[in-house]
Amino acid sequence: MKVLILNAGSSSQKSCLYEIPDDALLTEAPQPLWEGKVNWTQDRSVAEIEVKTAGGETLHESIYGDSRQAHVTYMLYTLSRGTTKVIGQLSEIDVVGHRVVHGGQNYRNSVIITEEVKQAIAKLSNLAPAHNPAALEGIEAIEKSLGDVPQVAVFDTGFHATLPDAAAIYPGPFEWVEQGIRRYGFHGISHQYCSARAAQILGRDLASLRIITCHLGNGCSLAAIKNGRSIDTTMGFTPLDGLMMGSRSGSIDPGIIVHLMRQSDYSAERLDYVLNKASGLRGISGVSSDLPQVIEAITQGNYRAQLAWDMYVHRLRSGIGSMLASLGGLDVLVFTAGVGEKSPGIRQAACEAFGFLGLKLDPEKNQNNPVDIDIATADSTVRVLVIHTQEDWAIAQQCWHLLNR
């Protein structure tokens, strides 16, 4: 079975092609046959296309035109044309899987995409304006290029559908619940993959483990996982809630928003920009939303950069503590995504606060670019894993299961 994956972002569209045996799902992620990416520059009419194959062929090209859908279609053509050709024709693809950030209340599981599903994704775009419209662009590009090939939507909110009401419902008027205003949670594909991978690495039954997964990238969230299910998470109604992030504020006193609207004449659009694009590491440090650049500024004595680091660590520790309370104990702590996988300093700072649990980090393992390994000491009562999140493979697995039911 040939499975094509599209993972849409606000400024990029990533894609890869897997070949999976029809009769048995592989236990570990295989190398994709082909990987493609469209990056949009500040000029919307210019797209940077990057393609590489398992055989080592690469393509870097700039293309012009106002249609993002056309740019994605061009990227897909490189699957069956030119030096990056890995299949004879696009019709060889059996199924296409899409990461869809927001599925709302109605989509708890992966589904075959229909017109009804597309309309629901579009309707939820106001809750994920940077991502749901981009997912629709990818879906429509596939319809144009591959016709009626089955397409599957895998929702980032789906894994958190098991949150108990006490964790999911906000303490506002009950009318909010009736309006669908609740904690949905995000990064669910990553949290679910990493919890299952942690159990696999440790040789343990997932249902027996109490796990906290820390997805720390430009966007950051934690999940508390018990019996293989999400029972608490830090992101909420939107991906703006929870931890301090690269350019997002995370949780703040809602009274600040009321104050700014009254005293400073902030519009909804300006608030949206400030909280999503000009806060977090970027807003506090004044340097960057990228943690390595903030760390570099710290070495040069930049006070605001140091403050940004300290706040990031404080809020991460507080979030882990909150998840710990929901679980009633902890067996495994997982770090994943760009910061989680690549920043030994953040892992060390986070773990230092939980020595009272008997958690002990192995300094050498932590510093040695760990991937899919346990970096706790042998006598630590909590296992600490660094896992390379593979959302694309997790989506491919969902596609395989749907088509083999």
From Swiss-Prot:
The record marks 187, 248 as: Transition state stabilizer. One of its GO terms (cellular component) is cytoplasm. Gene3D superfamilies: 3.30.420.40. Its EC number is 2.7.2.1. Keywords: ATP-binding, Cytoplasm, Kinase, Magnesium, Metal-binding, Nucleotide-binding, Transferase. Its main location: cytoplasm. One of its GO terms (biological process) is acetyl-CoA biosynthetic process. It is an enzyme of class 2 (transferase). Pfam families: Acetate_kinase. ATP binds at residues 14, 215-219. Its cofactor is Mg(2+); Mn(2+). Mg(2+). Can also accept Mn(2+). InterPro entries: Ac/propionate_kinase, Aliphatic_acid_kin_short-chain, Aliphatic_acid_kinase_CS, ATPase_NBD. Signal peptide: none annotated. It is found in: Cytoplasm. It catalyses: acetate + ATP = acetyl phosphate + ADP. It comes from the Bacteria. Substrate binds at residue 99. GO terms for molecular function: acetate kinase activity; ATP binding; magnesium ion binding. The active site is at 156 (proton donor/acceptor). Mg(2+) binds at residues 7, 391. Catalyzes the formation of acetyl phosphate from acetate and ATP. Can also catalyze the reverse reaction. Belongs to the acetokinase family. Homodimer. HAMAP family: Acetate_kinase. This is Acetate kinase. It comes from Trichormus variabilis (strain ATCC 29413 / PCC 7937).
